[in-house]
Amino acid sequence: MYSRRELEDLEYRYYSEMKDGTRKVKISESLFRCPFCYIDRKRDYQFDDLLRHASGIGGSSRTKDGRDKARHLALERYMRKYLRPRERPRPSPTSDVSSLPKEEFTGKWKSTLSTTEEGEFITTENSSSPHIVKAEPKFVSGDDSGRSGEERLKFSDKPDPFFSNEDKSYPAKRPCLVSGAKEGDEPVQRIGLSHGASFAPTYPQKLVSLGAGNGDQMYVHPWKGILANMKRTFNEKTRKYAGESGSKIREDLIKKGFNPHKVTPLWNGRLGFTGFAIVDFGKEWEGFRNATMFDKHFEVSQCGKRDHDLTRDPGDKLYGWVAKQDDYYSRTAIGDHLRKQGDLKSVSGKEAEDQRKTFTLVSNLENTLVTKSDNLQQMESIYKQTSSVLEKRMKEKDEMINTHNEKMSIMQQTARDYLASIYEEHEKASQHLEAQRKEYEDRENYLDKCQAKNKTERRKLQWQKHKNLMATQEQNKADEDMMRLAEQQQREKDELRKQVRELEEKIDAEQALELEIERMRGDLQVMGHMQEGEGEDSKIKEMIEKTKEELKEKEEDWEYQESLYQTLVVKHGYTNDELQDARKALIRSMRELTTRAYIGVKRMGALDETPFKKVAKEKYPAVEADKKAEELCSLWEEHLGDSAWHPIKVVEKDGIAKEELNEEDEKLQELRKELGEEVYAAVTQALKERNEYNGSGRYIVPELWNFKQNRKASIKEGVVYLVNSWKQKKPKPKRR
């Protein structure tokens, strides 16, 4: 990033290189080339195109490279000064120098002369400095002279500012013209006369900025004012002068309505305060208006610059004026300060600069508008494309829905037809059964009419039917009892499986024996009924006796196993009671231990206070956080102990009823909403533990716990831990 001073130095350096011929711009009379754009080396420009290229890059705010910007600014200034196309001047009777009065060769000039497009003249207006100006072609035709081909010259009031011999950017670096010509050189007056100009040049001591040749007054920009003859006091200790601060002077000027931005008193390292101050009014036109008011105020009060220069005894008067060209080039502290802080600009030059910036801004906005329009067109095309795709997809969706509806209607019709066919088959089966019933009734009636040959056969037939019916009923009843007993035994087996795994084989044998006994009893009953119907049958009798003996043996075995099972159950109950007593004693003993170990006592259903403290610190001040946490924890302890509140629901999964937490409970939802997920998790965990270990009373139950594996600890683990702890704490025997 270059400073303004560095950019000016770079611009002057490149300008000097083009001026010395180091860098070539002009290729031919009509073709030019940019010496700095290496990408476009082979591209040739017309004069106006290259000038537009240089001004576009040099004046654009988008140019990031300061060196490139300085190059093109130097190119633009060089082209405007030296390369504008020109032609040889045509002779005109009105450009005769001898016909002009003698007064125009001496003193200050009062007007500026412009010739035809073939000529080049040196003119000034209200200045002693000559300016080399490129004249614009302006032919004026009368009623008859234009037709005859005679040409007349038209004089313009102002010279072209772009071809002034003065440069506003580097006044300190340009060589000054001397008042006399060197020996052997052709005088400037003769050069001007040879081109048809009528003037007697006077050589300036320094070059001024662009815009000075058109007669405009040059001001220091940013607009500056000068205060002179300010009060100062001499300090005996420091042997220097002192004065008021810039802020106090600024406040006084603001009260008078001048609105300066800053006031800078000028100091000298040897003498101290010089009595002068620079008033900064800014760069805008409002600052120029304030500076003009400032100048008029002191001028009306006869305290302007002219009054300050003419008076010999200023007294206590405060003088002030606007900083202009002579102040800028003065060899005083004022001139040094102005040259460091600003440059010279005329009002017309400032207006031209603002117009150029406005034109650049408008062009940038136009480019942005074109870009936005292109983007809008792209978005419109994308929108149209998306709309067409969406419309196509909607049509496909409608077609899919119609196809689905048609398939559903076909499936429904097929289902209705299938149900109708089933109904028809059912009707046919019913009719067939009804026909069979009628057939049997007719057969029975036929048998009744025909009368059986003998009553014995009829009674035997009836008895056989009754016997078969009774046997079937008894068999069904035995099967039902057997199934019911099997289901009961299966349930008992499932309940006792976890506690008495060592008795499973015996229980299975007992169940098998009991089933065999029941089956044999059923067989005995069936045989008894069959014996009653058929009379005395030795084979059946033997089978009955044999079955009774086997049944008796089975019953004796069953009674033995039943007594053995009862004995084991009683022993298991005693053992279980002893284990529970031992577990309770172990829990009581481990409660007294204060050390934190992996085996200990956990209060199942206890509410963790840590989440409550965390939430209280976030929602309440630090002073009230602990108290609020205790209140919230106590409140939810009461809710957990309330038996009327039952946020547990029973859910049946795979035929098994399970208890689960009802997350839709109002209290739990309110808890989650107000206190967050951590408190909700702590409360639900305590609720699940209380429901598991003490669902009826829902109070805290101590339990032996393995904290390392987060599970319920066995009695063996607790005893081993106590023994190891006792061994560690047991005092070692003293050595003799």
From Swiss-Prot:
GO terms for molecular function: methyltransferase activity. This is Factor of DNA methylation 4. Residues 80-90, 144-167 have a biased composition (Basic and acidic residues). CDD domains: RRM_like_XS (cd12266). Acts in association with FDM3 and FDM5 for RNA-directed DNA methylation (RdDM). It comes from Arabidopsis thaliana. One of its GO terms (biological process) is gene silencing by siRNA-directed DNA methylation. The keyword Lyase does not apply. Gene3D superfamilies: XS domain. Keywords: Coiled coil, Methyltransferase, RNA-mediated gene silencing, Transferase. Residues 80-167 are annotated as: Disordered. It comes from the Eukaryota.
